[in-house]
Amino acid sequence: MGLEYHCPICGLSVSEMKDYDRKRGRNNCQCWKCGSLERHRFTYLFLQMYLGFFKDKRKNILHIAPEKCLYEVFKDYRLYVTANIFENRITKELFDITAIPHKDSCFDLIYCSHVLEHVDDDIQALREFKRTLKPGGRGRGHIVLDLPVRKDLDVTYEDFSLQTAEERKKAFGQEDHVRAYGKDIIDRIRSAGLTVENYYPSELFTPAEMKYYGLTDERLFLCR
C-alpha cells in the first residue's frame, strides 16, 4: 500500500492515520507524529497557502487553548502568547478571554479553535479579539476561528439554566459546552463588530487533496 496520507504540519506521510475516537466514528484522522486532527491541518494549510502567514516570523500571535501540533509551528515567532484558563506545559498565560490582559491592536493573528462554545459570554470574547487585533491596512491582523456548527439548527441554542454535565451533554452534545451554534453563526460573529468570511476545505482543495491531507469539510471563519 502506498503513502496515501500526508500531514502538512510535521511532514509525515503514511498509508493510514491513527484512530482518534472510535466511539464517535473518528477513525483514520490523527497524525501519528504530531497528533494533528483534520481541523489543525486545514488551519495550517489555510495560513500557509491562502494567507501567506509563514513568510515572516516578525509577527505577534495569540493562541487560545493551544494545540501542541500548532504550538510547534508558532513558538519561534516574535511574540507568541499561549493562553488558557488552566495550566499545562505549553500555556504561558492564564486568563479569561472576555478580559484579555493585553493592549489594543497588538496581535497579527488570533487563533481560537473549539473554545467559544465553552465560554458563557462568547460575544464579549469576540469583542476582546477585535480590540487586541491589529487594525486594517497592509499589515492588518486576522482572527481565525474554528467552531462546531450544527446544520440542523437555524438559531444558536443556549440555556444557562442547564448546569449539570448530563443536561449539557444532552442539549449541546458535550458536557462542558454552554451552547450549540446554528446557521446564524455569521450574524452572531458580526454582532461583535467583526467582518467575517467562511472557508470550506472543499472550496479550496480537490477531493484528492482533501484525502491526501486528511481533511473533513469543517469550515474556518476569517474575521477582522
Which positions does each model-derived feature cover?
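Activation segment
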Residues: 89, 101-104, 119-123
